[in-house]
């Protein structure tokens, strides 16, 4: 009781800020993002300390901790605190010469971090520096950040604002180019605007109804990917694979699609291969089983207009205001995991489904429901809503576009960027992050449900190779014609 009164007095005299609706839903100590930076040089601890002191701690969320405000129904709030950057940078004392398999060690080390709840008594981030050479990098920085601080796109933008171009060490990284509307878009709107609004309205009603059915009772079919949210225990394993961005672009250009369509199609094909291997019986029997499965993913959708890297840099350098944090919606994406003779069918199905999601307002309605629930029913109701969504679907999926040119992070040239968000009750979280000519497939799996995450990762890589070969066959056929 005394502790509560002391905390009340502290909150009354300290500038506080409430959590955003999505941050409320992601406020559990077990919800965080683990990002791995592979560097081309050895890590310099002093460079990280100086760099963070000059940038990240000036971002409000990185210099605040989460506290319970007993004046407002026990809701969590952000409270600014003084901190020592050294306390958030961890350099483990390791005998690197005795480590026989560095790649496996890093995988185990990252997974171990993923299984430790966040220390909520201090600002919710930490850096682990490993001066260990692996097959992909000379050293690594593993960053653990609580998900309430920001979503994947926000954190990527903020980290880019701390980075500089390799070609020009004093220059900020350029924003990734946004898709421009055609010059005649206004005329197009005038011509088909009425029909388009009918489509938007109808599609939104249908997709929103499916969302609410999922919240209420509609669950995925029990399958080898689906965890058991009721047991409350998850043992995380984090693995990744690096694929060629050029291979993805080849498929994208040939099929006239978006990168996200290709990645979703590849995911569907990989999941189909993996699920097929988990069922006994002949090929025909397995095909029948896969046809009956309902497998869906909660796909994160960025709702924020493009934030300029310069604005984020100014926020950290000058303390200026910049909208930043968790501003994402979620759509329920039905995954096509049936056996297909034509591997390109997985890409076509992904595009058709995503096109339907794009013209619906499902993601905005999702965010609106969270905001409404928080205002009228409180944070506990928001957490319960999130548990229903994540507990009734099989996996989470997101894709974060990284820089197109090589950059350095606190004077360390980057070789690759990997990252996984560990949220919700799903046993499988799939995330893609691009960097220059690479795309990293990141899987965070609950090993109590999925015991062979590397097999699943390999199935996704193999699926991409099969789709690429089929695409090259399409190119050859078009050339012949």
Curated annotation (Swiss-Prot):
Give the InterPro entries listed for this entry.
O-acyltransferase_WSD1-like, O-acyltransferase_WSD1_C, O-acyltransferase_WSD1_N
* GO term, biological process aspect, one: response to salt stress
In which tissues has expression of this protein been reported? Expressed in flowers, siliques, top parts of stems, and leaves. Not found in roots, seeds and young seedlings.
Identify its membrane topology class.
Answer: Single-pass membrane protein
Reaction catalysed by this enzyme: a long chain fatty alcohol + a fatty acyl-CoA = a wax ester + CoA; an acyl-CoA + a 1,2-diacyl-sn-glycerol = a triacyl-sn-glycerol + CoA
- Which residue ranges does the entry give as Lumenal-facing topology? 207-481
Transmembrane residue ranges = 186-206
Q: What happens when the gene is disrupted?
A: Severe reduction in wax alkyl esters. Reduced wax ester coverage on leaves and stems during normal and drought conditions leading to compromised growth and relative water content due to an increased leaf water loss, especially during drought.
Q: Which residues lie on this side of the membrane: Cytoplasmic?
A: 1-185
Compartments reported by the entry: Cell membrane; Endoplasmic reticulum membrane
Q: Name one GO molecular function term.
A: long-chain-alcohol O-fatty-acyltransferase activity
Q: Does the keyword Mitochondrion apply?
A: no
Quick check: keyword Transmembrane in the entry? Answer: yes
Q: Name any GO cellular component annotation.
A: endoplasmic reticulum membrane
Its predominant location is: membrane
Q: What does this protein do?
A: Bifunctional wax ester synthase/diacylglycerol acyltransferase. Involved in cuticular wax biosynthesis. Required to reduce leaf water loss, especially during drought.
Q: So what family is this one in? A: In the N-terminal section; belongs to the long-chain O-acyltransferase family.
PANTHER family hit by this protein: O-ACYLTRANSFERASE (WSD1-LIKE) FAMILY PROTEIN, WAX ESTER SYNTHASE_DIACYLGLYCEROL ACYLTRANSFERASE 1
Q: What is this protein called?
A: Wax ester synthase/diacylglycerol acyltransferase 1
